[in-house]
Amino acid sequence: MMATGSCGDGGGAQQAKRTDFTIGWSIYAGWMPWPYAQQAGIVKKWADKYGVRINLVQVNDYVESVNQFNAGKLDGVTLTNMDALTIPAAGGKDTSAIILGDYSNGNDGVVLKNAKSLSEIKGRTVYLVELSVSHYLLARGLSSVGLKLSDVKTVNTSDADIVGAFANPAATAVVTWNPQLGEVAKLPGAAVAFDSHQIPAEILDLLAVDTATLKANPNLGKALAGIWYETIALMQRQDAGGAAARAAMAKMAGSTPQSFDAQLSTTHLYGTPKDAVAAIRSPTLGSTMTKVRDFSFSKGLFGQGARSADAIGIGLPGKTLGDAKNVKLRFDSTYMELAAAGKL
């Protein structure tokens, strides 16, 4: 059984109050504020304020981090909107997205060798993390040039292995995210043929927490929101302190400060809690999640028992997409709103 077992309505299983929590993260520009906050003492400051202990743990493989969350080994994890839906939510784990951090605005891309346009991808073998946002981006790109997923062959490749795979002269198409995207785009003959700035606000980067754990321990949500907004305010400062914070994040991500700043330029950060609350309350989120769930269902990611894209309910502020009796992914603005109101 899952260590943070959750089932049923509204977060399900009754949870005892706890003080120790583990949050997983993987390397991505929009998630580097988390490990930096731990190093800089910001995690301890907010955790102490709310009487909890929060340990941030790096997982080298992104999909593995989401699987660990799904298996109850982590109380929360950094992940995308699509992966929150297709891994924990589709697996029956009631999951709450409590921080809307950013959207990918060029941080995810399709790279081709020796091609002038995306249409030349037809018939090629494409290396990517299958059934992830990379697969979604590929589908959106293909449809923009009148092609379908059946026009290409895909090979499942871990984000940790993707640069090496594309370095092979026989590999001519890849879909990945930064920092790997910047690496593969530098290879001889390579060029980005389609990227996420062409589908703004569709690939969302989140912090999600087990709903039952959050319900029993609301101070965890408050501490996480406090940590996040203090850290990203520092990160955005155009002074020596901001530059030092970004340089430290770059080092943790295995990037140079220049490369990290370039990655941030293709990340649309919701830079204040007010911005994030506006985004989570916008009708755009509903239309994005409709596209994402329709794609996910079409790829069989809701499991064999799912009869339609409505099988898994998605809770949005003020409304539910799909089955209101089976809500498994919740976009919960509570803690962002507390931050926006200065009430943390």
PLM segments and residue spans:
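Soluble non-cytosolic domains of exported or imported proteins
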Residues: 59-63, 128, 132-133, 160, ...
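Short, glycine-/small- and polar/acidic-enriched structural segments
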Residues: 12-157, 172-178, 191-194, 201, ...
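Conserved C-terminal helix/tail region of periplasmic/extracytoplasmic solute-binding proteins
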Residues: 293-344
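Ligand-binding pocket segment of bilobal, Venus flytrap-like solute-binding proteins
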Residues: 74-78, 162-187, 209-210
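Secondary-structure end/capping motifs
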Residues: 216-305
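Short, low-complexity disordered leader/linker segments with a strong preference
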Residues: 1-19, 327-344
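Alpha-helical segments flanking ligand/cofactor-binding loops in enzyme cores
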Residues: 66-67, 119, 163-164, 182, ...
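Periplasmic-binding protein-like
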Residues: 101-111, 187-213, 217, 221, ...
